[in-house]
Amino acid sequence: MGLDSVHQRQALKYRLRAMVREGQLTVDGRNFYGIPSNTGLIKGRIVGHSNGSGVLTPDEGTEDIFLPRKEMEGVFDGDTGLVRILRRDRRNRPEGGLIEVLQHNTETILGRLYFDKSTWMLKSVNPRITQKIIVSQSGLEKEGLIVRAKITRQPSFESMATCRVEELLGHSVSTDIKIAESLRNNEIPELFSKEALSSTAKLENQIMSSDFRGALRAYPFITIDGADAKDFDDAIYCEQDSDHGWRLLVAIADVAHYVPEDSPVDKNAFERGTSVYFPGKVIPMLPISLSNGLCSLKPGEDRLVLVCDIRISKVGTITDYKFYEGMICSTERLTYDQASNGFIAKPWGESLSSAKNLVAKLLVRRKKRGALDFETPEPDLNFDADGRISAVGQKTRNDAMQLIEECMLCANVCAARFIDELKLKGLYRVHERPDEKKMFGLRKFLSSLNVTLPEGLPSPIDLQGALNQLNKKLNGQVLQLAILRSLSQAKYDLRNAGHYGLNISMYTHFTSPIRRYTDFVTHRLIKSVIQS
């Protein structure tokens, strides 16, 4: 190009960088510049790995794209970027080059100070962030100390990130500090607004006479949850009818009665989206006075509910349903172990016995339908007084857990049918059919284990057959993760595309409005129809 002087080359470098910032050019990790094109560029979230490499998880839900260590030098875990697929490996997995960082999402960082030659550096305690970070201060003389620092310059391919220490935390990190850091990194607000707390403080701790809905108070409803549960948003009652079928009542806390749309509490709940659970600590979606108080279906206390009243045939099919507002007084709060053991002599014993008979029929039908059933063990973590993991066990899944899952599934299916039949603009829980390329790779992997999968796009019944074969093998529960990873990710959508994993034509979330905003949205939709 005839650039003979250092000054000319430096000027060109600055000009090229400016053109990249303005979107006129793109540049990759090898400093190759090109004309921007939307063709082949994939937007998504960067996920770091402890070995320095990473992946881009595309916003569109397609397969992850591997990013080598060099491509990760200019980004942190959690950043948003544009990637172009450069090649595929022998297993047809894509490898990409980072074209542009669209958004840096790390503003503060928790790390350990160390001295490298003549410079203070920070090593993140987050194993997904492996990049070197320069500390801008001098004279700290605190090697090995854990600190909280503010990122003052984000990483790039030309320079390392820099930070400024804001808080000295000691030589070890407490659980409270880790939780606070996680909340900060994921932008999860811990405190509710003054307006939200003020509006909930005005609510009475008991049902107002004007809200009285007495028709269901005589029914022996029960809640069944984990032993450590604090908020009870669902209760059930079941009876056998004269046709040898069942009537199942699923009563869900009527959160929408207390939280008007666009109110301060509603805005705070929308920001959170869900309740967030940490060891020994919960960040609730709703203020505690609602989530653990007025909306929680505590035994012996009148509570407003939205009821899904379901008729189920003797062969386990839903024949009819209706939604209505009600009020219940829960008879008993049971743990899963208590419900599994059963107390037939109790006032609610007959209802629980009927529910168990119903669920036995539902499980038979579920198996015939071909719904996927992953037998992945759930870890049971025990913590010491300092909040550190002291032991790891395995939770046992008993029949009471299945009972509640199937009852809630019935209510969710009915809610989806309600939305569909009335052509409402509601949120469906969609699980689309798997990608054919992923199925091709899965079929090759299963074949190496002598597990067969039919050609073409397999049905859920086909995949369940493969799961059953894997579970008979050594480390079968680990091997079945290959099938899980080959499936599409479930999502919320205004368009109903069915639920592949459950093998049903429509599904939504209705049963957890205390801790999940999408369920809250479904409640509002159903109540708007009931009240009109």
Regions found by a protein language model. Name each.
Residues 1-133:
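Charged, low-complexity terminal tails
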Residues 104-532:
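Conserved, carboxylate-rich catalytic/transport cores that coordinate ions
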